[in-house]
């Protein structure tokens, strides 16, 4: 299915049209059916006038009754068909918007994600896109068909009696002035209501993401109050929006009641003077009744558009967040691909303009092949090195190269295809163990998978699990231990056959036996691959070919363990504790 491309800085209605455009044929068909439905409805008052005239003159009314019955049946059938076509099209518009937005959110730069609440972004995909359904049917089509039906009805009323039409228009224009004052308030209230839904989603995501900590801290009552306050704020804003929408709808209804009473009074006087006959008055009153439907449709379209405009604004805001360029998928490195070299030259970096610098002119060289360890106190900037290599962020100044080529010159997909990355917290996604292992290499064969499972000592775990590799690991891998999650993350990285392997505290939760085994695995991998390790255990650091000592965002020394113990006081102090600082 075709989906709209992200557009920013454009009016909300134009963004809506970009979602509607792929479905314009179906939309036109539904609108045409709605117009035909309206046209058949306009004939009913005229048939009713003929029926009354026939009764007044004692003529047979069979033909008029049959015609009226046929029109009613046809009107109902066409209306039902048109409604189905429009609703189906509206669902397709929602699908297109969700596909566009979800694809865009997956390409968001990490810096943009850092500044937003995940729960609010989820609300934009689930809640805000749902409102496009009503905007498409009630607003876009409702305004078109309702407006045309309104004009056609007024024309027919003018044909029946121009004087009564003037009376009706005076009342309708008065109501329109009142509506013009109400509509902007609906837009503001709707935006605030949807923002409140996003805040509530963010609050819920925050709590569920750390539910064990909340329970262990006995913080349920306080967090419950936070959730309730967010829900109540959403309720207050939604009630405010509903108040103005109800005011708009009832203003239209009141206007039509006033119009009916006024037409009845003026029309009665005209019948009394002989200006018109009773059949004409009845026909005009039927048109007044019929006028209520398109007027309410137009008013509903305007009020619904204000709600949809707020939703489109939130969707547009999300599509305006900084994102990575779209890139074609690229194959992973082949077995035996040459290892990568990495260099940092005077790199300065901070996570946001209002935050202090993490790196203050970091420089180092990592040759192809071998293992390089990064050590230093917490907050020294070690993990940030890996984030910059992956281009989750770009440095403020300086240059980072891979194989002598600036990272900015690499296509992102090609760059990341060369890298295997094991994060500090070793995230595991909901799904099966197999899905998680093959996340970075869906085409991995069974033989390679079995070999990596053995290398990372996961083969025993797979044998113990009830469904083996197909066992579901739970939300964020809650059915696995911390050490098992780390081994899954390492196996996942190895299955990508990386030219550069980044291990950030990759063995921090492993027992001594598993750590020793994986240490041997990493040493073996380092013979053919470039391995960068952030580690806090001395046993891991001492096996590195070179060690980069970082402190306060600077590289203070580079060398082997033996060299640094005597040459660098900070490293000597860290080594003496037998436990290097975690984090940073």
From Swiss-Prot:
Disulfide bridges in this chain: none
Membrane topology: Multi-pass membrane protein
Domain ABC transporter: 342-577
Matching CDD domains: ABC_6TM_LmrA_like
GO cellular component, one term: plasma membrane
TM region(s), chain numbering: 27-47, 61-81, 140-160, 163-183, 246-266, 271-291
Annotated localization: Cell membrane
Family recorded in the similarity comment: Belongs to the ABC transporter superfamily.
The protein, known as: Uncharacterized ABC transporter ATP-binding protein SCO0742
């Amino acid at each position: 299915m075709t989906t709209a491309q992200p557009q920013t800085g454009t009016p909300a209605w134009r963004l809506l049209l970009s979602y509607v455009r792929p479905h314009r044929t179906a939309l036109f068909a539904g609108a045409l059916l709605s117009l035909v439905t309206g046209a058949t409805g306009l004939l009913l008052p005229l048939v009713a006038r003929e029926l009354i005239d026939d009764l007044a003159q004692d003529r047979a009314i069979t033909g008029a009754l049959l015609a009226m019955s046929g029109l009613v049946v046809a009107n109902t059938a066409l209306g039902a068909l048109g409604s189905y076509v429009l609703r189906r099209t509206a669902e397709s518009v929602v699908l297109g918007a969700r596909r566009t937005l979800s694809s865009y959110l997956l390409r968001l730069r990490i810096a943009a994600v850092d500044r937003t609440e995940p729960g609010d972004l989820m609300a934009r995909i689930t809640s805000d896109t749902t409102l496009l359904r009503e905007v498409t049917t009630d607003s876009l089509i409702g305004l078109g068909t309702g407006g045309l039906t309104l004009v056609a009805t007024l024309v027919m009323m003018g044909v029946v009696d121009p004087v009564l039409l003037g009376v009706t228009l005076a009342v309708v224009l008065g109501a329109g002035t009142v509506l013009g004052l109400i509509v902007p308030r609906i837009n503001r209230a709707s935006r605030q209501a949807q923002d409140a839904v996003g805040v509530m989603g963010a609050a819920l995501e925050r709590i569920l993401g750390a539910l064990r900590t909340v329970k262990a801290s006995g913080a349920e009552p306080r967090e419950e109050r936070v959730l309730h306050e967010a829900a109540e704020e959403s309720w207050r804003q939604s009630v405010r929006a509903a108040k103005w929408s109800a005011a708009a709808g009832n203003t239209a209804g009141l206007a039509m009641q006033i119009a009916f009473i006024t037409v009845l009074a003026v029309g009665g006087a005209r019948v009394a003077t002989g200006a018109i006959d009773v059949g004409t008055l009845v026909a005009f009153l039927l048109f007044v009744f019929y006028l209520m439907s398109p007027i309410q449709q137009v008013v509903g379209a305007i009020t619904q558009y204000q709600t949809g405009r707020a939703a489109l604004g939130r969707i547009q805001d999300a599509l305006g967040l900084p994102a990575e360029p779209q890139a074609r998928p690229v194959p992973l490195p082949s077995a035996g691909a040459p290892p990568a070299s990495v260099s940092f030259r005077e790199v300065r970096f901070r996570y946001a303009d209002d935050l202090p610098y993490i790196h203050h002119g970091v420089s180092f060289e990592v040759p192809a092949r071998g293992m390089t360890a990064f050590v230093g106190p917490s907050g020294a900037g070690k993990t940030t090195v890996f984030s910059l290599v992956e281009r989750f962020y770009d440095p403020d100044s300086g240059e980072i190269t891979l194989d002598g080529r600036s990272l900015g010159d690499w296509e992102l997909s090609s760059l990341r295809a060369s890298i295997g990355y094991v994060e500090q917290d070793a995230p595991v996604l909901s799904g099966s163990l197999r899905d998680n292992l093959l996340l970075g290499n869906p085409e991995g064969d069974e033989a390679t998978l079995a070999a990596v499972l053995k290398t990372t000592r996961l083969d025993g775990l797979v044998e113990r699990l009830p469904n083996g590799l197909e066992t579901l690991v739970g939300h964020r891998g809650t059915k696995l231990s911390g050490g098992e999650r780390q081994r899954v993350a390492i196996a996942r990285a190895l299955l990508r056959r990386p030219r550069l392997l980044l291990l950030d505290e990759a063995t921090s939760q492993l027992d001594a036996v598993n750590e020793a085994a994986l240490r041997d695995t990493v040493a073996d991998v380092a013979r053919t691959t470039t391995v960068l390790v952030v580690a806090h255990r001395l046993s891991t650091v001492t096996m590195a070919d070179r060690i980069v000592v970082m402190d306060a965002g600077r590289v203070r020394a580079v060398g082997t363990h033996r060299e640094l113990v005597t040459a660098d006081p900070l490293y000597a102090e860290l080594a003496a504790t037998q436990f290097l600082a975690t984090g940073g």
